[in-house]
């Protein structure tokens, strides 16, 4: 008689126990083996151990990461953790291959293609407190190469649609992620707004040797740093931040010249500072004359010429008995025009010196004067001399230059509360908004530049195929009353009255943007 299996097990307990043990072994042992071979841990613990293991490995290699303060692992503020990870610990990005060598005391070059390579902010170091100074408004730095030029026919700012205190900041886009595409070459670079840029500045007064004393605002105690943290944002595109390696590759084996006054030299100092993150130049100037300098970047065989010509045309300094400059409005200043055949790029600018007392000569005869009050001499306006001088200078470029030329427009001054010699100062700490306008005299000089440029551009294309471009930066710089040295271009001395400098620009500062625009225009031309 056959019995069911459960009946057999009831009668023979030992068989039941043995069978149960076999089933237990066959079920549990494989599971234990899987668990021991590949443990399943909570995601946060797994992520922590992965990052911790990587950090331990890096610390044991030759490329050690400096130990963080208090033994904590810093979270890079610029790194966004992977959306697939649930850990709060951020991976440290791998270094890029082939970093650009830079001077050891300089900020390394920022690779704009990645959001990882943000330049450390030099503003983490304490800003020196301004020394004790007289509160008088008529202090100012000693100007470069002579007295600060007399003001243009300055009028107060005309407020169109808002007050000057409206400094609301628009939403900013990281300059490291935006570039002007090929199909945006016709973008108007010169109409736009200043937007915050927390990545700036890209050099400091301690890392760049080229900053002139009178533009070294932080050295002389300027208490605010916000003026360094803006970038120019055109309306219909984004302007890339200046890339020094890209610039040097573009000008490899070539020569560039800057012609003009101390604002032109101010821009050159900015360019030298921006390029110093890649290479220091060698001074190969043929003479000790500081008005004519030549630097060479040996790794790129690039030469940079700076030529002092504040009037652009032939001029003679006043004799001891006179305060009048003599301007020969129909004669070239051969100190720079004779160098044109050696250059591939040219940046020409001027304006401020034309507000000085001058006597005009044409055809070797006195044709008039400005601010002279001489008997039997026609008093002529500023616009007369400037138009004539700019016209003949552009003619010299058309006839003697075969490269790419830029006419940089007038850089405005921002005296408030009086003229340069009447206690005027520039104490604003934020940019103007675009709906605030400019002094009328600045508009006159700017209008002349635009008119003469159009005529020269047409003439140059007909005669020689000259590539002449207008770098119309007046609006951008007009909106930056906060960018001047003011009283912070010299030591503060309560016993000495010095005038404020509201003409030149602090370095680093807004004038760095001129080189952003210069590089972009060079790229567009190519």
Swiss-Prot record:
May act as a bridging protein that binds pectin and other cell wall polysaccharides. Probably involved in maintaining esterification of pectins. May be involved in the specific O-acetylation of cell wall polymers. It comes from Arabidopsis thaliana. It is found in: Membrane. Contains 2 motifs that are conserved in esterases, but it is unlikely that this protein belongs to the catalytically active pectin esterases. Belongs to the PC-esterase family. TBL subfamily. It is a single-pass type II membrane protein. GO terms for cellular component: membrane. InterPro entries: TBL (IPR029962), TBL_C (IPR026057), TBL_N (IPR025846). The chain crosses the membrane at residues 15-35. Residues 57-183 are annotated as: Disordered. One of its GO terms (molecular function) is O-acetyltransferase activity. Residues 81-97 have a biased composition (Basic residues). It comes from the Eukaryota. Its main location: membrane. A motif (GDS motif) lies at residues 260-262. The keyword Iron-sulfur does not apply. Residues 57-73, 133-143, 153-163 have a biased composition (Polar residues). This is Protein trichome birefringence-like 21. The keyword Transmembrane helix applies. A motif (DCXHWCLPGXXDXWN motif) lies at residues 501-515. Keywords: Membrane, Signal-anchor, Transmembrane, Transmembrane helix.
């Amino acid at each position: 008689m056959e019995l069911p299996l459960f009946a057999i097990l009831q009668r023979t307990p030992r068989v039941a126990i043995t069978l149960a043990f076999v089933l237990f072994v066959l079920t549990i042992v494989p599971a234990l083996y899987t668990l021991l071979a590949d443990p399943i841990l909570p995601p946060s613990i797994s992520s922590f151990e992965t990052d911790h293991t990587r950090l331990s490995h890096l610390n044991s290699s030759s490329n050690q990461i400096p130990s963080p303060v208090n033994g904590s692992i810093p979270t890079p503020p610029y790194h966004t953790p992977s959306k697939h990870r649930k850990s709060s610990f951020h991976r440290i990005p791998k270094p890029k291959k082939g970093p650009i060598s830079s001077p050891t005391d300089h900020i390394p070059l920022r690779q704009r293609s990645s959001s990882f390579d943000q330049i450390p902010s030099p503003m983490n170091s304490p800003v020196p407190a301004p020394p004790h100074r007289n509160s008088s408004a008529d202090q100012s730095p000693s100007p470069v190469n002579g007295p600060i030029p007399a003001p243009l026919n300055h009028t107060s700012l005309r407020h169109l649609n808002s007050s000057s205190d409206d400094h609301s900041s628009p939403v900013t886009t990281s300059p490291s992620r935006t570039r002007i595409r090929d199909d945006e070459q016709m973008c108007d670079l010169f109409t736009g707004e200043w937007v915050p840029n927390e990545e700036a500045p890209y050099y400091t007064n301690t890392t760049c040797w080229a900053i002139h004393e009178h533009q070294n605002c932080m050295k002389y105690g300027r208490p605010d740093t916000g003026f360094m943290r803006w970038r120019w944002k055109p309306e219909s595109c984004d302007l890339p931040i200046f890339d020094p390696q890209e610039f040097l590759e573009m000008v490899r084996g070539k020569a560039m010249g800057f012609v003009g006054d101390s604002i032109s030299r101010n821009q050159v100092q900015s360019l030298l500072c921006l390029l110093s993150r890649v290479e220091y130049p060698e001074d190969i100037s043929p003479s000790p004359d500081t008005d004519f300098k030549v630097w060479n970047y040996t790794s790129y065989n690039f030469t940079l010429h700076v030529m002092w010509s504040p009037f652009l045309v032939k001029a003679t300094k006043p004799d001891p008995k006179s305060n009048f400059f003599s301007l020969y409005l129909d004669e070239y200043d051969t100190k720079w025009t004779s160098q044109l055949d050696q250059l591939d790029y040219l940046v020409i600018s001027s304006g401020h010196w034309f507000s000085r007392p001058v006597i005009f000569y044409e055809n070797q005869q006195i044709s008039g004067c400005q601010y002279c009050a001489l008997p039997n001499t026609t008093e002529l306006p500023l616009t007369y001399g400037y138009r004539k001088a700019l016209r003949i200078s552009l003619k010299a470029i058309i006839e003697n230059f075969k490269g790419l030329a830029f006419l940089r427009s007038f850089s405005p001054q921002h005296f408030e509360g009086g003229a340069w010699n009447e206690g005027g100062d520039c104490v604003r700490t934020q940019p103007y908004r675009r709906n605030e306008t400019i002094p009328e005299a600045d508009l006159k000089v700017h209008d002349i530049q635009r008119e003469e440029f159009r005529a020269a551009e047409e003439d140059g294309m007909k005669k020689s195929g000259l590539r002449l471009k207008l770098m119309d930066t007046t609006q951008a710089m007009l909106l930056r009353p906060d960018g001047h040295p003011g009283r912070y271009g010299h030591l503060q001395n309560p016993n000495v009255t010095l005038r404020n400098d509201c003409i030149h620009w602090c370095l680093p500062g807004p004038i760095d943007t001129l080189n952003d625009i210069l590089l972009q225009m060079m790229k567009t031309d190519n």
